[in-house]
Amino acid sequence: MKIKPILELIPEVKRPLKGVSFKEKIQWTGLVLILYFILGTIDIYMGGAEMPAMFAFWQTVTASKMGTLITLGIGPIVTAGIIMQLLVGSELISLDLSKPMNRALFQGLQKLFGIFLCFLEAVMFVGAGAFGVVNSTLALILVLQLALGAILVIYLDEIVSRYGIGSGIGLFIAAGVAQTIFVGAFGAEGYLWKFFSAMSVGSLGIAFEYILPILSTLFVFLVVVYVESIRVEIPLAHGRVKGAVGKYPIKFIYVSNLPVILAAALFANIQLWGMFLDRMGYPILGQYSNGTAVSGIAYYFSTPYGISNIISDPLHAIFYTLMMVIFCILFGLFWVETSGLDAKSMAKKLGNLDMAIKGFRKSQKSIEQRLKRYIKPITVMGSAFVGFLAAAADFTGALGGGTGVLLTVSIVYRLYEQLVQEQLSELHPAVAKFVGKR
C-alpha cells in the first residue's frame, strides 16, 4: 500500500505563490495568536462532568488550557515529531532526509500521524479520568471535541510556518507561559503583592518565599539571554569577489529550544500513559494518587518542583536531571539530521552561495569537513546545557515552570532574530539571502 496517495488527501494550508512581505507575516502571526487565545476561551461540552485539577504537568509544554478546545494543545504535533524522529533515527523508516523530496514525505507522514494522535490522546485523556467517570456517549462526545481542537491547532501551526514568523509551536508556548508569569507575578493574588504585604508586617521569611519564584524567573531569563549570545564564528571568503569576507556563526544553542520541547513533551506523555494505564488497572509505569505519580518509572520522570522535594528525595531529582540531559542530546542530534542543519546540508548551502572557509580549498567537501568539527560537538554541548538548565530551573519553582520560562525566553529571542532577518530581506534581499540560509 502506497502512502503518498493518502497524504495527498489530507487538507493542507496552501503554500504562498509569492514571497510574503514582512508586514503580512506580522499580520498572519498576530491573527493566529488571537485565534489560539479565542480557542482557549471556548469551553467544550462536558455534560456536567467536572475536570479534576491533576493535569498541570500537561499544560506548560503543550501550551494547553484544560476544559477548552485547546485541552490537548500542541501535544499531538510534538509527540508525532518525537516518534517520527525516533523511527527515522533508528532506521525503522528508511528515509534519506538530505533529499528535499524525502523531507517533504517525512513532514507529510508526521502530519498524518499527528492527526491520528489527536484522536488517540483524546481517548487517553478521557480514559485517564480527566473528566471523571463518564458514560460511553459522553466519552465519545468529549473525544471528538478534544480531537477537533487539536486538529485546528495543527493547521494554525501550519499557517504560521508558511505565512508567519517562527513556528506556531513556539508561539503558543511563549504566549501561554508569558500569560502565566504575568498573572502569577502581578495578578490579584500574585507573588509580588504577597511579597509587599509580608514585608509590611515584618514577616521576612514568608516574604522571601514569595519573592523567590520571581527571582528564579529573572535568573533563568538572564542565563538564557547570555547563553543565546555565545557562538563560534567561522571566517568565510567569497569566491567571486576578491577580498570580500564574512563570518558564519554557529550558536552554542545550535538547535534552539527544540530538544527541551521534545524531551518535556515525552515526559508529559509518560505521565499521561501512566495515568491511563493505572486507571485501566495496569500500573505498568507506576501508581498514581490524586493524579500524581507515587511509584514506578512515571514517578522518576515527573518533575520534582521546589527545593523541599529535592531534599526529601535527591535520587528522584538526580534521575530526572540525567534523563532530561540525555534526551535533550538525543533529540538535538536527531533534529540536526532531520531539519537540514547537519554539516553536509549547511556546506551545500554555503557552496551554492559561492562561499568558502577562509584559508581552505573552495569545495563542498572541504567546507563539510570543517563544519563537522564544530556542529556535532556544539549540538551535544548545547543540548546538554539546555536540558540541565531546564531541570534546574524547574527545581527553583520559577513562575510558569522552569522549563516554560527557558522555552519562552529562547523562543522570544529567536523570534526577535527572525524579525531582524525579515526586515533585512526587505531592505536588502542580497544580504538576507545569506542571513536567511544560515
Curated annotation (Swiss-Prot):
The reply on keyword Transport is: yes
The annotated topology with respect to the bilayer is:
Multi-pass membrane protein
* A GO cellular component annotation in the UniProt record: plasma membrane
Q: Which residues does the entry place in the Cytoplasmic compartment? A: 84-104, 162-167, 232-256, 336-378, 416-438
Which processes are annotated in GO (biological process)?
A: intracellular protein transmembrane transport; protein targeting
Q: Does the keyword Transport apply?
A: yes
Q: Which UniProt keywords apply?
A: Cell membrane, Membrane, Protein transport, Translocation, Transmembrane, Transmembrane helix, Transport
Give the source's domain of life in one word.
Archaea
Per UniProt, the intramembrane residues lie at 55-62, 63-74, 75-83
Mark the transmembrane ranges: 1-43, 55-83, 105-129, 137-161, 168-186, 210-231, 257-278, 316-335, 379-397, 401-415
Subunit and interaction comment:
Component of the Sec protein translocase complex. Heterotrimer consisting of alpha (SecY), beta (SecG) and gamma (SecE) subunits. The heterotrimers can form oligomers, although 1 heterotrimer is thought to be able to translocate proteins. Interacts with the ribosome. May interact with SecDF, and other proteins may be involved.
Concerning its family, UniProt says:
Belongs to the SecY/SEC61-alpha family.
| PANTHER family attached to this UniProt entry | SECY/SEC61-ALPHA FAMILY MEMBER
Q: Which HAMAP family does the annotation name?
A: SecY (MF_01465)
Entry protein name: Protein translocase subunit SecY
